[in-house]
Regions:
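Charged, alpha-helix-forming regions
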Residues: 1-251
Length: 251
């Protein structure tokens, strides 16, 4: 991919590839985990995952400058200089929780830190190295994985949109949808877990407004999908969402 590299504390680190048309590929078990990253932290992690390419046997350390990160995120560099410590702290302090299932039921979550290194240095930029414990979820994926171009999530303005977009993608089995689209059923509890909303917005109406509606609006605005949804109810309680998904190309 023609990348430069630098020596940092005796370790070779590679420059970020900045071509956002490249794919972010993750095992569905990683997509379906509990995640609590804020918006820019989530985007930086996905940019780091995009660096993993077919044939990689290891997760490599990377460097990205403040200016390049600002360009990726579409914000002024001054904002990144102001926020970079919060972003790196967020990534380090909020691991992903991988769902372990038995007979279709979640029995526990396994906590895995995203990174072994994520720090800013004024002379080199941001050094980031994904955790080797994530290798089964990022390297040599043959089946049960989700992929999308980085540019699709970089333009999103809500981390809930990123997470629900990934959940929908993980359940779509073909690149081209049938003419009438498809319907995807997701339990409300699973959406809450994936969006770090188990305890936020306890009233469903508030959760719908703040999370589901915001996500669906963003997905419809910036992706190839047209999404609406209906409910699965048990008595008066909404226990699941049926996402109705079709192709919608933006001209």
């Amino acid at each position: 991919m023609g990348r430069g590299h630098k020596q940092i504390e005796g370790q070779i680190s590679f420059d970020f590839c900045l071509d956002t048309r490249n794919y972010v590929c993750q095992a569905n078990t990683l997509v379906g985990g509990k995640q609590a990253l804020k918006l820019n932290s989530a985007k930086l992690i996905r940019a780091a995952i995009m660096q993993v390419v077919k044939g990689d046997e290891e997760l490599k350390p990377y460097i990205i400058s403040i200016r390049d990160l600002a360009e990726l995120l579409g914000v002024p560099a001054s904002n990144i200089y102001r926020d970079i410590e919060n972003i790196t702290d967020d990534i380090i302090s909020n691991p992903v929780y991988i769902r372990e299932e038995r007979a279709g039921k979640t029995i526990r979550f396994i906590k895995i830190p995203w990174v072994t290194r994520c720090e800013y240095s004024s002379d080199i930029g941001i050094a980031i190295e994904l955790n080797d414990k994530l290798k089964p979820f990022l390297l040599n994926l043959k089946e049960h994985y989700t992929q999308y171009t980085l540019q699709e999530v970089l333009v999103m303005k809500s981390v809930y949109a990123i997470r629900i977009f990934e959940m929908i993608q993980s359940k779509i089995m073909s690149k081209i949808l049938p003419k009438d689209g498809i319907s995807i059923e997701v339990p409300v509890q699973e959406i809450r877990e994936c969006c770090d909303c188990e305890d936020k917005y306890p009233a469903f109406g508030n959760f719908k407004d703040k999370v589901i509606d915001k996500a669906v609006s963003e997905i419809n605005r910036v992706t190839m999908y047209s999404v609406n949804y209906s409910y699965i109810k048990e008595k008066r309680n909404v226990i699941g969402i049926i996402f109705h998904v079709n192709m919608c190309y933006h001209g």
